[in-house]
């Protein structure tokens, strides 16, 4: 219901604004599981109830959205999809990398959005296999659709 969705969104924003994401070992362990053992990640997600699935996907999305501010000096991305893929890939690199980017002590400084990021094919033009991590949030959203027959509610309507 709308009240529960708003509460989940408020929790995600509070989780980010009060830096609880930095110490959320469970969240980051699940992110790491998705990059090193995708089958185990899928199994774990499948065992989550609706609230846990929504909480995870929305927190992941919030972390992606916060990268926008840090990436703005790099100029416009090649496309909206490549920017979204890059943000998902960056969150999937884990807590230390994400924190360094957000804190301005590492990460995308100096990257040129017009060239592919080393180790990341922005436009998938080479046919290279997709790097682990880009689709972590999508896995949760896909499971939601399979389970409930509808798109996962969009968090930006609530924060």
Regions found by a protein language model. Give the residues of each.
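Generic, low-specificity signal for short hydrophobic/alpha-helical stretches with a mild N-terminal bias
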Residues: 13, 38, 42, 80-83, ...
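Generic preference for hydrophobic/aromatic residues in regular secondary structure cores
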Residues: 31, 75-77, 140
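Core of folded catalytic or high-affinity ligand/protein-binding domains
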Residues: 43-119
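Basic, alpha-helical nucleic-acid-binding regions used in initiation and control of genome expression
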Residues: 95-159
């Amino acid at each position: 219901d709308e009240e529960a969705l708003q509460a989940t969104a408020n929790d995600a924003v509070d989780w980010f604004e009060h830096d609880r994401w930095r110490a959320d070992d469970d969240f980051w362990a699940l992110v790491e599981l998705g990059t090193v053992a995708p089958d185990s990640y899928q199994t774990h997600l499948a065992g989550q109830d609706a609230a846990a699935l929504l909480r995870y996907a929305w927190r992941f999305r919030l972390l992606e959205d916060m990268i926008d501010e840090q990436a703005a000096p790099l100029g416009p991305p090649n496309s909206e999809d490549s920017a979204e893929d890059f943000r998902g890939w960056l969150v999937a690199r884990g807590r230390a990398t994400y924190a360094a980017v957000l804190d301005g002590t590492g990460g995308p400084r100096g990257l040129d959005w017009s060239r592919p990021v080393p180790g990341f094919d922005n436009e998938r033009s080479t046919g290279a296999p997709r790097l682990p991590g880009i689709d972590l949030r999508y896995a949760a959203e896909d499971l939601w659709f399979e389970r409930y027959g509808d798109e996962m509610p969009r968090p930006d309507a609530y924060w």
